[in-house]
């Protein structure tokens, strides 16, 4: 029957005591997708980890708010990935002596320059010729891989350099702080769990293009000021995120049941993926 739904099966890996990878098909791994929506690319990842109501919420976010790329363009910001050493065929002395932000020791929201190592090398593969502003203050630095399901970023008020595993955005410091508050939220992680083709499938990080496509609410001056206050508190106490989370959910105009949806995905879906058989789900 041409009107029959598509049966979509997404078995999840399980881990035995012997830690041998096996696959089993649970009833929750099978869903029936109406044929009239199979051309919507979003459904496949959402059907794997979410529910029909998640497709509605993702659609609402995408249709209500412009992508971060538009926010960046409207606010005359500069973006790029950091330098690359790789085959190290270029010599460049421009970065010598500058603070170096490294992904492995990345500190969210803010790190003082005296806590960072200094660049003591001059061999590079890519030296970011056309977007050097990303290394100039004020700048937002985004870590493309997550920590326990949360994405980290920091806003620095001094020049610093970083490699291509980090993204840089140069622009107005208050608007950068606003973006940082959003990036560290559960809403941001929820969106990418359910839309990113590779996260929770084959990669544990986001690509730059994925991040730039995140829907971002357009804030008022008062909301920017509120975000800055929240950011400054997070810079001192990064773990105290309740106020930040409430602010972000208000910006996205989330209803109470939509907030529960987001928490369910983070608390159960991500938890399942990360902790395997020890998951709360």
Regions found by a protein language model. Give the residues of each.
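Conserved beta strand-loop-helix elements of the APE1-like EEP
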Residues: 1-4
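Active-site loops and adjacent core secondary-structure elements that bind or stabilize anionic groups
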Residues: 7-8
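N-terminal glycine-rich flavin-associated loop
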Residues: 13
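Non-catalytic DNA-recognition/assembly elements of restriction-modification systems
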Residues: 23-84, 96-97, 101-104, 218-281
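Polybasic, glycine- and aromatic-enriched phosphate-binding surface used to engage nucleic acids
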Residues: 53-225
């Amino acid at each position: 029957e041409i009107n029959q739904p598509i049966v979509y099966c997404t078995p999840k890996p399980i881990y035995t005591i012997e830690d041998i990878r096996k696959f089993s098909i649970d009833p929750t791994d099978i869903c029936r997708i109406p044929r009239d929506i199979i051309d919507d690319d979003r459904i496949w990842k959402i059907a794997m980890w979410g529910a029909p109501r998640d497709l509605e919420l993702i659609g609402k976010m995408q249709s209500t708010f412009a992508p971060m790329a538009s926010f960046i363009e409207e606010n005359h910001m500069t973006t790029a990935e950091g330098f690359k050493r790789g085959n190290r065929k270029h010599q460049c002395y421009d970065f010598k002596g500058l603070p170096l932000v490294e992904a492995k020791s990345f500190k969210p929201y803010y790190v003082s320059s005296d806590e960072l190592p200094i660049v003591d090398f001059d061999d590079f593969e890519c030296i970011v010729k056309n977007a050097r502003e990303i290394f100039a203050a004020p700048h937002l630095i985004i870590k493309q891989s997550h920590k326990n399901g949360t994405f980290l970023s920091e806003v620095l008020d001094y020049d610093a350099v970083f490699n291509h595993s980090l993204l840089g955005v140069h622009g107005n410091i208050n608007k950068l702080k606003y973006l940082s508050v959003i990036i560290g939220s559960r809403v941001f992680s929820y969106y990418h769990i359910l839309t990113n083709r590779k996260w929770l499938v084959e990669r544990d990080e986001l690509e730059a293009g994925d991040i730039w496509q995140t829907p971002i609410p357009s804030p008022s001056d008062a909301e920017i000021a509120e975000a800055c206050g929240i950011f400054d508190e997070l810079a001192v106490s990064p773990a105290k995120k309740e106020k930040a989370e409430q602010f972000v959910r208000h910006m996205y105009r989330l209803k109470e049941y939509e907030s529960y949806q987001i928490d369910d995905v983070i608390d159960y879906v991500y938890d399942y993926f990360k902790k395997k058989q020890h998951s709360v789900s």
